[in-house]
């Protein structure tokens, strides 16, 4: 019998959610995380109402809500076009990934999961009883045996490159992401609101996080970045020149950190299983950040993986059917959202089309996007 029932590769929101729930059911769980916490991540730091529902399943909603900024309204500013105000049907939460990831990983350990930070997974090999997982901690390489693997290694891990999972995405549009922190806004202009800004070849957003600081994150097409001078300052200058509301907003803010970049990013769904491993979070596909649903889908997919695995452990589902059942359930819950995300991406990254749509549809377009992209109930469905 392997020493672990499940090895979870990655301690982000999806991995910690899966690990904590499985450990809560008495399963022997090991988390292998290459970074040491707390850590900065390129992310929108936005927890939609669906994400709050997932936190409720974990028993963390009240705890996170008490610390986070509550977002109830916002505005979408189209480059060279109108600025469209909107209200969210349910309050969202804004909390830095440093705080969120550390809190979730600590919670998973409190449920009984073991965790090793600074442990870089080098490879997975099938074995008669499950998997051999190779990982290194500094110069030392080790191997551990497990019955199942949950892959929560993010959008483009070395494991993805080894397993050639990005061949299909590499033929698509490449994006790069960034984030930066600003000191608290003294006039409270961003209290309870989010600003979304479109510019040629990309988009970005501003929102308050815990403590009153303002978080800035965005995406730009690699083809657009290559036409600009090197560095994130050139991307920001391009965005500000194209979008006056963004320029006005940033002129009132003072940076408190340097830019942090990430990429390449391929915005597409990937297979939800790979050789028996269950893919969760960005490892199963990167949802467009402008949807505000990335963290919600990450948490919900972690919950789904744990729920499906527990059915296998308990005998309610045949053990060999676990990957197939997870893949079918993942597609049922998330595939349509990826489709709508791609459709709206073609709109928001094309300035002429975006301007025309904003002038013609305005608030109706924003409300439709919120309805199509922000469908709630994922966590409740997964947990049923």
What are the language-model segments listed below?
Residues 1-14:
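Beta1/beta-strand and adjacent pyrophosphate-binding region of the FAD-binding site
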Residues 23-43:
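Glycine-rich FAD pyrophosphate-binding loop
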Residues 36-56:
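Conserved N-terminal glycine-rich FAD pyrophosphate-binding loop of Rossmann-like flavoproteins
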Residues 50-105:
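A conserved beta-strand/loop capping segment in the N-terminal third of enzymes
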Residues 70-76, 251-268, 325-332:
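Flavin (FAD/FMN) cofactor-binding core of flavoprotein oxidoreductases
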Residues 107-249:
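Predominantly flavin-linked oxidoreductase catalytic cores and closely associated redox partners
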Residues 224-308:
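FAD/FMN-dependent oxidoreductases across multiple families
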Residues 307-384:
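C-terminal helical "tail/cap" subdomain of flavin- and related membrane-associated enzymes
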């Amino acid at each position: 019998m392997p020493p672990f029932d499940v090895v979870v590769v990655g301690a982000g929101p999806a991995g910690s959610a899966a690990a904590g729930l499985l450990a809560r059911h008495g399963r022997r769980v090991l988390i292998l995380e290459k970074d040491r916490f707390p850590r900065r991540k390129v992310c929108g730091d936005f927890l939609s109402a669906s994400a709050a529902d997932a936190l409720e399943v974990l028993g963390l909603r009240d705890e996170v809500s008490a610390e986070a900024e509550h977002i109830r309204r916002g505005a979408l500013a189209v480059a060279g076009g109108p600025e469209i105000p909107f209200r969210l049907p349910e309050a969202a939460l804004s909390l830095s990934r440093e705080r969120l990831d550390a809190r979730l990983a600590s919670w998973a350990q409190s449920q009984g999961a073991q965790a090793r930070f600074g442990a870089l997974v080098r490879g997975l090999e099938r074995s008669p009883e499950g998997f051999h997982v190779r990982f290194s901690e500094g110069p030392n390489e080790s191997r551990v045996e497990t019955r199942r693997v949950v892959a929560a290694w993010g959008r483009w891990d070395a494991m993805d490159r080894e397993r050639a999972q990005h061949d299909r995405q590499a033929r698509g549009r490449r994006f790069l992401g960034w984030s930066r922190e600003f000191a608290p806004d003294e006039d409270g202009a961003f209290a309870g609101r989010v600003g979304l800004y479109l510019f040629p070849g990309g988009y970005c957003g501003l929102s308050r996080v815990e403590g009153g600081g303002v978080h800035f994150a965005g995406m730009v097409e690699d083809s657009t970045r290559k036409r600009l001078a090197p560095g994130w300052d050139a991307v920001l200058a391009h965005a500000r020149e194209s979008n006056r509301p963004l320029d006005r907003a940033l002129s009132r803010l003072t940076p408190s950190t340097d830019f942090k970049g990430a990429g390449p990013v391929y915005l597409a769904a990937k297979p939800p299983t790979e050789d028996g491993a269950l893919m969760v979070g960005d490892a199963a596909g990167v949802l467009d950040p402008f949807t505000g649903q990335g963290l919600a889908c990450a948490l919900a997919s972690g919950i789904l993986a744990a729920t499906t695995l527990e059915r296998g452990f308990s005998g309610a589902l045949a053990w060999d059917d676990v990957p197939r059942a997870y893949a079918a359930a993942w597609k049922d819950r998330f595939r349509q959202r990826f489709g709508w995300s791609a459709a709206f991406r073609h709109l928001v990254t094309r300035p002429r089309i975006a301007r025309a749509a904003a002038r013609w549809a305005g608030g109706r377009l924003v409300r439709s996007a919120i309805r199509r992209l922000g469908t709630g109930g994922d966590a409740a469905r997964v947990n049923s």
